[in-house]
């Protein structure tokens, strides 16, 4: 199981009982890989906004009825104004990142040549009224929060028949952890400065009636590569407007960062403070405070709430830092500090008591291991799926054909929704969406045959020795019994993962005897290891 929470969103009184399994950003990534989004120069083009700056709308907005008719009249279903082609104003370049709901591209403003990031959400992924509300809410919230130094600025929102496009300032300074790792030296004072920027975002959101609900390191990017670059919060896809004291019930977020009251399905804005506290713990130690072999184990650890301050490097970390972490990670939300109180804590203040002595170098190496996802395992899973025999997958093949009602060679969300009950599979709407998002590896809104097989094959098939050996042979081109750096690069280039940094990450993660290559025993151990990752593995569908 992955360590990422569900990206399906509901308003609080619409929440239905779901399996408590946040699945995600992820990022990823990956999206939870997040798209870097650099800052425009002064005098940017006038933002393309709703005709008047909207106040926070009620979560239950009246539906535009009929939605389809609106689209046919040339009025966008999401933004509620005449459709406009973003490509008339911006030239799209390379892909910057990919998430469950959209792909982010480099976008150049034609009149000025200034560069932005454009998050493009395919209209086919907005099949239900809730989906439209979610994107509409994200646009409203980003406009509502505009102007804060540490929140990415939305420059314009465009909608045509094929997609909704959000043009934002481009952050080219990289992810939070990447900057720390690349710098190689790090202190409590540096951690305090970063935490101050993160909590400043939380304080601004809460004071303006917005709960973020998905705070994690991957959702913070540096604006540029300068040492004094501001840190920017970039993803408000799970955010909601709230009133003081209002409680929510839908399960959202990411497993490592999710608050205990979210798992209990009754929470308010204090859940953001918990998530920020988890980030601070990682900034100081390199690992999350709640850790287990799988997602359920992480949730159990979160609910138990035991925080380790005895292992390295905690004995050498200041009492002020530990005090702040403890007060942000109180089990009872009412006992947690507010964002304003955190910013006044003596350890975090700009002129505060956080020491400037370097933290142990192992903190950075542990952070790097925690951040790196096992890309080799993901490719190996696909290799196994492609090499299963016809006899082994005959049942899955028939299942695919029965779901693919239009014989297009792909399965859409609507086909899954209609077909699974006929196969005797009871599944909630939120689980259906989690399943679709997890299986749709290339993010195109549908599941192709190989994606379907990869997602549905049972783990006991995967663990068969001959399947693992076939996957190993795929990488071990010269049959030497080892996967070398060159062989990794050759195999992963096919999947656009063959860069030097990724190869080094994989070797560091899998090569347990440190000989610079991967032997068969190390490969088997990796394939059978279920330790959670930042971005989700594909969920088993049945």
UniProtKB/Swiss-Prot annotation:
GO MF, any single term? calcium ion binding
Assigned protein family: Belongs to the protein kinase superfamily. Ser/Thr protein kinase family. CDPK subfamily.
**For bias kind Pro residues, which ranges apply?**
41-60
Domain Protein kinase: from-to ranges: 90-348
What this chain does, per the entry, is described as: May play a role in signal transduction pathways that involve calcium as a second messenger.
Q: Where is the lipid attached (N-myristoyl glycine)?
A: 2
- Tell me what gene encodes this: CPK15
Could you tell me which InterPro entries the record lists for this protein?
CDPK_Ser/Thr_kinases, EF-hand-dom_pair, EF_Hand_1_Ca_BS, EF_hand_dom, Kinase-like_dom_sf, Prot_kinase_dom, Protein_kinase_ATP_BS, Ser/Thr_kinase_AS
For the region Autoinhibitory domain, give the residue spans: 354-384
Q: What class of enzyme is it?
A: transferase
Q: Which residue stretches belong to region Disordered?
A: 1-73
The way its activity is modulated is described as:
Activated by calcium. Autophosphorylation may play an important role in the regulation of the kinase activity.
Cellular compartments annotated = Membrane
Q: What reaction is this protein's catalytic activity?
A: L-seryl-[protein] + ATP = O-phospho-L-seryl-[protein] + ADP + H(+); L-threonyl-[protein] + ATP = O-phospho-L-threonyl-[protein] + ADP + H(+)
- Would you tell me the protein name for this molecule? Calcium-dependent protein kinase 15
In which residues is Ca(2+) 4 bound?
A: 511, 513, 515, 517, 522
Q: Active site located where?
A: 214
């Amino acid at each position: 199981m992955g360590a990422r929470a569900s990206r399906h969103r509901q308003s609080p009184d619409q929440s239905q009982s779901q399996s408590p399994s946040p699945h995600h950003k992820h990022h990823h990534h990956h999206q939870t890989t997040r798209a870097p989004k650099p800052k425009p120069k002064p005098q940017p083009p006038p933002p393309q906004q709703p005709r008047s700056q909207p106040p926070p709308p009620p979560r239950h907005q009246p539906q535009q009825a009929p939605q389809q008719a609106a689209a046919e009249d040339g009025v966008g279903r999401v933004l509620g104004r005449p459709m406009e082609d973003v490509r008339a104003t911006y030239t799209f370049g390379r892909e910057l990142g990919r998430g469950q709901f959209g792909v982010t591209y480099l976008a150049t403003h034609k009149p000025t040549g200034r560069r932005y990031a454009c998050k493009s959400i395919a209209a086919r992924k907005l099949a239900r009224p809730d989906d439209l509300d979610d994107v509409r809410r994200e646009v409203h919230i980003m406009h509502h929060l505009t102007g804060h130094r540490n929140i990415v600025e939305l420059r314009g929102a465009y909608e045509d028949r094929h997609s909704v496009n959000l043009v934002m300032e481009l952050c080219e300074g990289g992810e939070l952890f990447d900057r720390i790792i690349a710098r190689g030296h790090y202190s409590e004072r540096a951690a305090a400065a970063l935490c101050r920027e993160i909590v400043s975002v939380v304080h601004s959101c809460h004071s303006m009636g917005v709960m973020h609900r998905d705070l994690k390191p991957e959702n913070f990017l540096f604006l540029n590569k300068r040492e004094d670059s501001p840190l920017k919060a970039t993803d408000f896809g799970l955010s909601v407007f709230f009133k003081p004291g209002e409680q929510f019930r839908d399960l959202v977020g990411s497993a490592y960062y999710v608050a205990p009251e979210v798992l209990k399905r009754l929470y308010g804005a204090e859940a953001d403070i918990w998530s920020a506290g988890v980030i601070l713990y990682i900034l100081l130690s390199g690992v999350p405070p709640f850790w287990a072999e799988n997602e359920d184990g992480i949730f159990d650890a979160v609910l138990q709430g035991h925080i380790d301050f005895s292992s390295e490097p905690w004995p050498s970390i200041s009492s002020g830092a530990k005090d702040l972490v403890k007060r942000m990670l109180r089990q009872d939300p009412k006992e947690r500090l507010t964002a304003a109180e955190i910013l006044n804590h003596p350890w975090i203040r700009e002129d505060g008591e956080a020491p400037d002595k370097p933290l142990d170098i192992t903190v950075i190496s542990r952070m790097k291991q925690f951040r790196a996802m096992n890309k080799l395992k993901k490719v190996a899973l696909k290799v196994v799926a492609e090499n299963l025999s016809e006899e082994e997958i005959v049942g899955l093949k028939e299942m695919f054909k029965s779901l693919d009602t239009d014989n297009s060679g792909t399965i859409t969300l609507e086909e899954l929704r209609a077909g699974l009950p006929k196969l005797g599979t009871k599944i909630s709407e939120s689980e259906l969406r989690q399943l679709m998002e997890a299986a749709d590896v290339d993010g195109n809104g549908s599941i192709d045959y190989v994606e379907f097989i990869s997602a549905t094959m049972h783990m006991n098939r995967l663990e068969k020795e001959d399947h693992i050996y076939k996957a190993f042979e795929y990488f071990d081109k010269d049959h030497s019994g080892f996967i070398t750096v060159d062989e990794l690069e050759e195999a992963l280039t096919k999947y656009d993962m063959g860069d030097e940094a990724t190869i080094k990450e994989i070797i560091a993660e899998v090569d347990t005897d440190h000989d610079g290559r991967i032997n068969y025993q190390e490969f088997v151990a990796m394939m059978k290891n279920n330790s959670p990752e930042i971005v989700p593995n594909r969920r088993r569908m049945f």
